[in-house]
């Protein structure tokens, strides 16, 4: 992969209210997501899917992060977290667990911010358990509001996601956060 392409796989470090200084990991191409949220800052979802796919190689993602980490060290910038906050849903990446394991070699905590859509899957929970900090999105407690706000992939079921979040809480040893977009119906 060319340097210009590698540079698109990570960004920062940037200030984060929750994570201090974080270096963003962009493991998903733009707008590949399992949701099409009405409030998405990235615009319309281009590829709505729930199939986990290989988007980039683990080596390319790690090399991109390494380049940014080295550049930050040269500037005496601290990095508190390597944060998976891509332009789509990070758990759609079938290599997420391997990427987290490979990035741990830098000695920096790993965070993943997810819309929780695939948390019902055991393989996704297993991958997320390798991170140090995970945030899962909860925008609605009813199927009607959930579809209205998050416009989820039609094959997803809110009950499965809610159960998966409960299962994940009992399996995960790190810091577990949730985030919610409040809206007026």
Predicted feature residues:
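Auxiliary Fe-S-binding modules of radical SAM enzymes
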Residues: 1-21, 59-63, 70
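Canonical Radical SAM [4Fe-4S] cluster-binding loop centered on the CxxxCxxC motif
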Residues: 17-60
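Short glycine-centered, acidic/aromatic-flanked micro-motifs in structured strand/loop junctions
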Residues: 27, 84-86, 180-182
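Short strand->helix junction
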Residues: 30, 47, 89-90, 183
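Conserved alpha-helical substructure of the radical SAM core
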Residues: 43-83, 98
